């Protein structure tokens, strides 16, 4: 196609259209209004959120579910800096995202003008790459490059656009994505490494599979299940990726990592071979839990990972396979079959069932311990039982939200969207809005602590405006309980900054925004409240369920590895030293 005359705004909009972008999230601003004016005609909906951080979290979840690189935007200066947290979270989640950042106009750069700051430096360390439009004629080209990098490197790319570069006349050729970025070029990996892996797996006595995010991205559910049954290998899910193996399969042993399943950890503890499929084996996701140092030091590790930067990054590997999770696993299946029939190990299967049943019994008993206020585990247990199979769960970070890792199971992929290792609060509800846009017919349930809810409740207004009927399960324990637990265990119950005494209830605020809401104070009312929430959701209403829970029933500290009892040297602080703590 020949080059045609257009404006930079039109050139960038045409790139978005050809990339299949149906919506952009953000808060409008004068810096990009010339391009914004084009979007309704182009078929791109602008979702106007109440805080730019929501824009990025929505698109993070949207991309994780659809696989499509998503786009968010903010006004230069404060609008763009409000995107920092959500972009950093997406970067650690390996989510392809294009972040459009209008910046100060070139004639005034360096004069500390209105809403001017060095946006490029801010985003350099939290994205895969920072790009700048050097001239209006390059606007379309730079945006195409952003999509190319976002897909290739699996993460956000920041595009800095001086606000005067949206205007003018340029000559641009409108290109299809397959003309400027590779589509589906991943392979199964090196044949020699695949052959080595096959020999190790065939000889393994206690192989264990860790199924990670790459399994979902590559649509490798069937392949992982097949190789697991060939090997009678228990399958553990990597940290906060609980939807990477079907929970109704007999080889499912649950997630690892903080508040994961002991059945998974004991299985890994016995492993002589670990087959990590689509997992980077992150440091936080493999730390000891429940005082179980479960990641085996002497096991042989076969790591299938599409990104060579993640191979052997935390744990030394025996066989590195740089390849697509689906294709590499399929090749291993073929090679194992060529070696002859692999018979199921009935004894091992019985052990797996025993460990699963022990874990299910343990977490149910913990949930059914009576309490007033309600035991928070009881809420998680009841809600997990009632979750529709096609529902999507989004989870925040914090004491209760992290405990959800023990209770929720999934039979389908792309059903668990978690805050992951960036660990910011104020994620679950905002991500839930994006998940609801991605799957309008699926119920979306957000698990949120009352601390995180203070950073989220304003977005009920967005949910109502755009008819996104997300169900927020808000746990009202009157405190930042993850940090409270640290002050209990390491600071002798000296509480500073942990309490959240007001409001008495969040429900009046939710109703004022236009949502439906129920405050639940008795355990026997949990199930009925959640069923009512599902009914309201089916009618198109956003829902807030406020569960009043016991703030003294707490999970272990997140970072036992990074905390220590206090030592104090100055006389005026000596009484705070751990040597004066009561002896247990």
Curated annotation (Swiss-Prot):
EC number(s) given by UniProt: 2.3.3.15
Pathway: Organosulfur degradation; taurine degradation via aerobic pathway; acetyl phosphate and sulfite from taurine: step 2/2
Keywords for the protein's UniProt record, in alphabetical order: Acyltransferase, Cytoplasm, Magnesium, Metal-binding, Thiamine pyrophosphate, Transferase
Cofactor(s), names only, from the UniProt record: Mg(2+); thiamine diphosphate
GO cellular component: acetolactate synthase complex
GO-annotated molecular function: acetolactate synthase activity; flavin adenine dinucleotide binding; magnesium ion binding; sulfoacetaldehyde acetyltransferase activity; thiamine pyrophosphate binding
Any single biological process term in GO: taurine catabolic process
Compartment annotation: Cytoplasm
Alphabetized InterPro entries for the sequence: DHS-like_NAD/FAD-binding_dom, Sulphoacetald_Actrfrase, THDP-binding, Thiamin_PyroP_enz_cen_dom, Thiamin_PyroP_enz_TPP-bd_dom, TPP-bd_CS, TPP_enz, TPP_enzyme_TPP-bd
Pfam family, any one: TPP_enzyme_N
Catalysed conversion reaction: acetyl phosphate + sulfite + H(+) = sulfoacetaldehyde + phosphate
Record CDD domains: TPP_PYR_POX_like, TPP_Xsc_like
Quaternary organization: Homodimer.
Record-stated family: Belongs to the TPP enzyme family.
Name recorded for this polypeptide: Sulfoacetaldehyde acetyltransferase
Species for this entry: Desulfonispora thiosulfatigenes
């Amino acid at each position: 196609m020949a080059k045609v005359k257009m404006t930079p705004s039109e050139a960038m909009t045409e790139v978005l259209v050809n990339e299949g972008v149906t919506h952009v999230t953000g808060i409008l601003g004068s810096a990009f209004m010339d391009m914004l004016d084009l979007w309704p005609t182009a078929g791109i909906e602008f979702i106007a959120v109440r805080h730019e951080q929501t824009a990025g979290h929505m698109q993070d979840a949207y991309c994780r579910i659809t696989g499509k690189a998503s786009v968010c935007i903010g006004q230069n200066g404060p609008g763009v800096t409000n995107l920092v947290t959500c972009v950093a979270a997406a970067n650690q989640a390996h989510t392809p995202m294009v972040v459009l950042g209008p910046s100060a106009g070139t004639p005034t750069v360096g004069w500390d003008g209105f809403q001017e700051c060095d946006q490029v430096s801010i985003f350099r360390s939290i994205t895969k790459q920072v790009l700048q439009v050097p001239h209006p004629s390059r606007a379309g080209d730079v945006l195409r490059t952003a999509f190319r990098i976002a897909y290739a490197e699996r993460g956000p790319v920041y595009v800095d656009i001086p606000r005067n570069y949206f205007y003018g006349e340029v000559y641009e050729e409108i290109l299809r994505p397959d003309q400027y970025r590779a589509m589906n070029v991943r392979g199964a990996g090196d044949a020699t490494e695949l052959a080595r892996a096959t020999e190790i797996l065939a000889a393994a006595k206690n192989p264990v599979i860790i199924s990670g995010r790459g399994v979902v991205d590559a649509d490798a559910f069937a392949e992982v299940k097949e190789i697991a049954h060939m090997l009678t290998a228990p399958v553990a899910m990597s940290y906060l990726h609980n939807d990477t193996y079907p929970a109704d399969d007999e080889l499912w042993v649950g997630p690892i990592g903080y508040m994961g399943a002991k059945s998974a950890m004991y299985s890994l503890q016995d492993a002589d071979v670990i087959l990590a499929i689509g997992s980077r084996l992150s440091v936080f996701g493999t730390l000891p839990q429940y005082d179980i140092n479960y990641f085996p030091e002497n096991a042989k590790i076969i790591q299938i990972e599409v990104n060579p930067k993640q191979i052997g990054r935390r744990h030394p590997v025996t066989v590195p396979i740089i390849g697509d999770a689906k294709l590499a696993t399929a090749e291993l299946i073929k090679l194992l079959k060529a070696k002859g029939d692999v018979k199921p190990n009935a004894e091992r299967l019985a052990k797996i069932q025993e460990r699963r049943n022990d874990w299910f019994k343990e977490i149910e008993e913990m949930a059914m311990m009576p309490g007033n206020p309600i035991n928070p585990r009881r809420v998680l247990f009841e809600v997990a039982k009632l979750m529709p199979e096609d529902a999507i769960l989004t989870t925040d970070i914090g004491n209760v939200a992290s405990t959800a890792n023990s209770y929720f199971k999934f039979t389908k992929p792309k059903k668990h969207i978690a805050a992951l290792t960036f660990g910011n609060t104020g994620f679950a509800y905002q991500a839930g809005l994006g998940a609801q846009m991605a799957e309008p017919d699926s119920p979306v349930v957000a698990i949120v602590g009352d601390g995180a809810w203070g950073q989220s409740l304003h977005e009920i207004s967005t949910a109502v405006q755009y008819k996104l009927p997300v169900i927020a399960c808000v746990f009202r324990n009157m405190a930042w309980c993850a940090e409270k637990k640290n002050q209990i265990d390491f600071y002798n119950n000296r509480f500073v900054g942990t309490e959240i005494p007001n409001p008495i209830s969040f429900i009046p605020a939710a109703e004022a925004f236009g949502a439906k809401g129920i405050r639940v104070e008795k355990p026997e009312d949990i199930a009925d409240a959640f069923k009512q929430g599902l009914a309201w959701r089916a009618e198109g209403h956003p829902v807030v369920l406020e569960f009043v829970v016991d703030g003294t029933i707490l999970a272990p500290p997140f970072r036992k590895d990074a905390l220590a009892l206090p030592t104090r040297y100055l006389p005026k602080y000596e009484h705070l030293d751990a040597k004066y703590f009561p002896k247990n």
